[in-house]
Amino acid sequence: MQFQTTEQFSQVAAELLRHHYLAQLAGTYLANPDAQLACIHQGIQPFEAVNAVAREYGLPRMEIGLFGLSLASPDRPLIEDDQLNACERLGLFELLQDVPLYVERASA
């Protein structure tokens, strides 16, 4: 998945933080557009950047299960599929066009 703008990157990173950690992008170094641009140029995906933020700030990952919210295993980082789901929730389908994992999932 190739991000072209810091706006796209920050939208996805913010959604991952909100959905999986009940946290906000504001107050983290990922809120800085220069940091977002550096991630884009280095090929770092939002889920990878959010994993680093979660480790740095000691954020517990949350999961939604049958009985509501619960803590996820601390050694279970976000993966690409979590990012694909975030893009779908945000309606950023243009980012998903060339992602083999999404194309396979969408055609199933």
Predicted regions and their residues:
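C-terminal alpha-helical interaction appendages
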Residues: 1-108
